[in-house]
From Swiss-Prot:
SMART domains: BRCT (SM00292), HhH1 (SM00278), LIGANc (SM00532). DNA ligase that catalyzes the formation of phosphodiester linkages between 5'-phosphoryl and 3'-hydroxyl groups in double-stranded DNA using NAD as a coenzyme and as the energy source for the reaction. It is essential for DNA replication and repair of damaged DNA. This is DNA ligase. It comes from the Bacteria. Belongs to the NAD-dependent DNA ligase family. LigA subfamily. NAD(+) binds at residues 33-37, 82-83, 114, 137, 174, 291, 315. The gene is ligA. It holds the Pfam family HHH_2. It comes from Vibrio vulnificus (strain CMCP6). PANTHER family: CHROMOSOME TRANSMISSION FIDELITY FACTOR 18, DNA LIGASE. Zn(2+) binds at residues 409, 412, 427, 433. Its cofactor is Mg(2+); Mn(2+). The active site is at 116 (n6-amp-lysine intermediate).
């Protein structure tokens, strides 16, 4: 029973990781927020029951959301966490009870309440009153530098007003697009025959992620502050609400609906009032945020892995509509998972037109009792992601058709299998399956794997469709001349891809393991395997018993690893990759005997490094004991400056921070 539950936990992790990427990176979610939240709460409940099963790559240990490659990355000095959700008065009461139980001597009665804006979380850094950096939340630890775009937002002060502001302060808040501005933007797009945005949130996110800030400047964006991060120079009020008022005096806008209330009943009344006036408000919201007002209590309550214990988002009820289920298509993912996708009569619900919804698996189809031709209830839980929640069976006409789950893969026609205890049906074709092949190759060249610049999804799909590659090793046999037969592929672009493939041959053992796409082996697990076994050969021949000795590897993951390397076709792929020249440096022994000359030092990398990639340099510095951050401050001990170093180098010089060169870094290594 315990093994079955742990296996289910691993499946939950996989699903949560997948849907987080669909939501935060691809902007193409498959399931409603409510379903994601349910899965997350189920995962956290199992982990609470079995804390020994918690792994570093668990979704409970991080904030959803991944920084894109288009912008320079920024490391948040204090993580920008997300919020836990409540969907009922009972869950709100449980949140408050947990807080009070943790601090029995405190009287928790004052709460700062505000609408939960449906936009994009950002961080604004002011130094000596001047805006010097703006960043997205990203994954909570690392975000995107969007300073030039944020400077175009009229409600964001470029310089703080008044007096008495800290020498350094980070203000966090939400960038959003008011309803009126959104409608006007879409009206202009329609008149020009251009594509319109589906909702204000997407419009705000798309506007902030423009590489050309002149485009952002034309978009009707607004900003409201909701909290403070780093503060240096002065002490702020011990009241969260009073901090809001102080920010307002310095020229930072706050949501006018924000209130300080006393007592649980007042919190509920605030929620009911905002819900009642929701449609009349000039901006989109999907709930209210409730924060314990006392900063001292906040600090003592602290955080869980992904959210503060002193705040919660009380979400509004999901919005629902009726529509017809016209058909069901079956999609195949990288690991062979076959997912039924409902094709719906388009319906406008929760601010977007919905035409697709996931049906998850065969069990879900059976549970719903849904048939093609049924009238179904579509819900957009959290106002973001659609799902089929029920069937209106009394509207059936008698010509509805059963949904037949395929017995063979819809792409490669290999037989499908469903392992006992799993809800997912999988194609057994592996890389023989064109769908799996495409997804496996996309994973292989992705940023966190081999990181092949320029080899995007559309290029991979063409290569597979034209039968130019079958396995990852085939990529390294491509010539520029061969690549030019692809659509929109000129000689220069083709040569750039060949060059990028050659550069990617020099990697690390951890990246190589991750690139292979072994089920459940994410970045952290791959790194643990590399550190533990040191060589690929040792991992390939490791027994199940040896594998479960590795930190964060349990029975299920160990089975996936041994099964992968036991497959002859996988052995051939790995060998072919080695023969193509993929190499990595020896994995260093980690332990007290390894000197850490930078132990406890705060280090910043800036400029262009010629001998190391930025990622490799960061990893090397961390092995030497350093904490690598993304911005220079008084707390910075060393700045390693490469070629064309800019503002960070200038700031380091102004602050008197020690500056070293790339050669100094190489000497340390």
């Amino acid at each position: 029973m315990s093994e079955s539950k742990q296996q289910y936990l691993e499946e939950l992790k996989q699903q949560l990781h997948y849907h987080a990427v669909r939501y935060y990176v691809e902007d193409n979610p498959e399931i409603p927020d409510a379903e994601y939240d349910r899965m997350m709460r189920e995962l956290m409940a199992i982990e609470a029951e079995h804390p020994e099963w918690i792994s570093v790559d668990s979704p409970s240990q991080r904030v959803g959301g991944v920084a894109l490659d288009s912008f320079r990355q920024v490391t948040h000095e204090i993580p920008m966490l997300s919020l836990d959700n409540a969907f009922s008065d009972e869950e709100l009461e449980s949140f408050l009870k947990r807080a009070q139980d943790r601090m029995p001597s405190a009287h928790i009665d004052a709460f700062c309440c505000e609408p939960k804006l449906d936009g994009l979380a950002v961080s604004l850094l002011y130094e000596n009153g001047v805006l010097v950096q703006a960043a997205t939340r990203g994954d909570g630890t690392t975000g995107e530098n969007i300073t030039e775009n944020v400077r175009t937002i009229a409600s964001v002060p470029l310089k703080l007003q008044g007096e008495g502001w800290p020498s350094r302060i980070e203000v966090r808040g939400e960038v959003f697009m008011p309803k009126a501005g959104f409608e006007k933007l879409n009206d202009i797009a329609r008149k020009k025959g251009e594509k319109v945005f589906v909702n204000p949130r997407n419009a705000a996110a798309g506007s902030l992620r423009q590489l050309d800030s002149k485009i952002t400047a034309t978009r009707p964006l607004a900003f409201y502050a909701y909290s403070v991060g780093v503060v240096e120079g002065i002490s702020l009020s011990s009241s969260h609400y009073q901090r809001f008022l102080q920010l307002k005096q310095w020229g930072l806008p706050m949501c006018p609906e924000t209130k300080l209330v006393n007592g649980l009943e007042s919190v509920k009344a605030f929620y009911a009032d905002i819900l009642n006036r929701r449609d009349a408000l000039p901006y989109e919201i999907d709930g209210v945020v409730i924060k314990i007002d006392d900063i001292v209590i906040q600090e003592k309550l602290g955080f869980v892995a992904r959210a503060p214990r002193w705040a919660i988002a009380y979400k509004f009820p999901a919005q629902e509509e009726l529509t017809l289920l016209n058909d069901v298509e079956f999609q195949v993912g990288r690991t062979g998972a076959i997912t039924p996708v409902a094709k719906l009569e388009p319906v406008f619900v929760g601010g977007v037109t919905v035409s697709n919804a996931t049906l998850h698996n065969a069990d879900e189809i059976e549970r719903l009792g849904v048939m093609v031709g049924d009238t179904v209830v579509i819900r957009r839980a959290g106002d973001v992601i659609p799902q089929i929640v029920s069937v209106v069976k009394d509207r059936r006409k008698g010509d509805e058709k059963n949904i037949i789950f395929p017995t063979a893969c819809p792409v490669c026609h290999s037989h499908v299998e469903r392992i006992e205890g799993e809800a997912v049906t999988r194609c057994s074709g592996g890389l023989v399956c064109q769908a799996q092949r495409k997804e496996a190759l996309k994973h292989f060249v992705s940023r966190k794997a081999l990181d092949v610049d320029g080899l995007g999804d559309k290029v991979i799909e063409q290569l597979v469709d034209k039968e130019m590659v079958e396995t990852p090793a085939d990529l390294f046999t491509l010539s520029a001349g061969v690549l030019t037969v692809l659509e929109r592929m000129g000689p220069k672009s083709a040569q750039n891809i060949v060059n990028a493939l050659n550069v990617a041959k020099e990697t690390t053992l951890a990246r190589f393991l991750y690139s292979l796409g072994i089920r459940e082996v994410g970045e952290a697990t791959a790194a643990n395997l590399a550190r533990h076994f040191k060589t690929l050969e040792a991992i390939q021949t490791a027994t199940h018993e040896q594998l479960i000795e590795v930190p964060d590897i349990g029975e299920v993951v160990a089975r996936h690893i041994t099964a992968f390397f036991a497959e002859e076709k996988n052995q051939r792929v790995v060998q072919a990759l080695i023969e193509q020249g993929i190499v990595w440096p020896a994995v260093e022994e980690l332990g007290s005997e390894i000197p850490q000359p930078l132990a406890g030092k705060v280090v910043v990398l800036t400029g262009t490094l010629t001998q190391l990639s930025r990622g490799d340099a960061k990893a090397a510095l961390e092995r030497l004991g350093a904490k690598v951050t993304g911005s220079v401050s008084k707390k910075t001990d060393i700045v390693f400056a490469g070629e064309a170093a800019g503002s960070k180098l200038t700031k380091a010089q102004e602050l008197g921070v020690e500056i070293q060169t790339e050669q100094d870094l190489l000497a340390l290594l």
